[in-house]
Design a protein with these regions (language model features):
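Non-transmembrane functional regions of envelope-associated proteins
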Residues: 1-166
Length: 166
């Protein structure tokens, strides 16, 4: 049994999953994916530090929407309100785009009486504006390849592709 566990959860499992992934004919065309990074270069170009005002995210959604993307995905958890004008601007952009997906996150919280996994979701205003929500956090294997996704929550990639989402 120990040998079986090693085979199913070790290097052979990774090789097996990699081979199946390689042979899968329904892979997405990476030429169809555009990533707009929010990084140090972006901060310098915008002459702003993080967090950016929500108007910036709203304008980003408005500009990207002009190219009619299948979806616009933010790997950012907008869990706290900003100022009302800024949040409303972003919510309006989300509503107009009709294809925005925002991140949620899971974390373990330990309390005095109860401990458990808690989901952190975007503020209600953005979901009411039509944003879909997907789980952002995934864990890579020891070789830094992501092969497993949580099965109890819709990941950002599943929501973007329309898989497993109501």
């Amino acid at each position: 049994t120990i040998f079986t566990v090693f085979l199913l959860h070790g290097p052979l499992e990774r090789i097996y999953i990699d081979t199946l992934s390689y042979l899968h004919e329904g892979q997405a065309n990476v030429d169809d994916v555009v990533i707009v990074g929010i990084d140090e270069t972006s901060f310098q170009a915008m002459d702003m530090q993080w967090p950016w005002p929500r108007e910036v995210h709203g304008e980003l959604v408005n500009e990207i929407s002009k190219f009619n993307p299948k979806s616009i995905v933010f790997d950012v958890v907008f869990s706290e309100p900003s100022n009302e004008v800024s949040d409303n601007h972003f919510a309006e952009a989300i509503s107009n785009a009709k294809k925005v997906i925002l991140a949620s996150d899971l974390s373990f919280r330990e309390g005095e009486y109860v401990s458990g996994v808690v989901e952190t979701r975007p503020i209600e205003l953005f979901e009411k504006a039509g944003a879909l929500v997907g789980l952002a956090g995934v864990e890579a294997d020891v070789d830094m390849v992501v092969r497993h996704f949580p099965q109890f929550e819709n990941t950002l990639s599943e929501v973007a592709s329309g898989e497993n989402y109501p």
